[in-house]
């Protein structure tokens, strides 16, 4: 996997090379895992991957903001957002890799 962004195709190729499944099976596997994660988030559940991190839906309250062009106050409606919190293991691993 090269470049600044890892894509679905990159994940499929890595699974193909390391596990030995066909490229088609790898693509289906990656798609199914991502679909299951999306379904869990749609139900409001957390997706916890041990040693990696937690994806969760968070509620943001209504607040006053500003229109960046005009500077006028603007109401921002309450909404839900998806958040990710990296595990301590992941944080340490990335920190170590980037400090080399």
Curated annotation (Swiss-Prot):
Pfam families: Bac_DNA_binding (PF00216). One of its GO terms (molecular function) is DNA binding. This is Integration host factor subunit alpha. This protein is one of the two subunits of integration host factor, a specific DNA-binding protein that functions in genetic recombination as well as in transcriptional and translational control. InterPro entries: Hist_DNA-bd, Histone-like_DNA-bd_CS, IHF-like_DNA-bd_dom_sf, IHF_alpha. It comes from the Bacteria. HAMAP family: IHF_alpha. SUPFAM superfamilies: IHF-like DNA-binding proteins. Belongs to the bacterial histone-like protein family. GO terms for biological process: DNA recombination; positive regulation of metabolic process; regulation of DNA-templated transcription; regulation of translation. Keywords: DNA recombination, DNA-binding, Transcription, Transcription regulation, Translation regulation. GO terms for cellular component: cytosol. Transmembrane segments: none annotated. Heterodimer of an alpha and a beta chain. CDD domains: IHF_A.
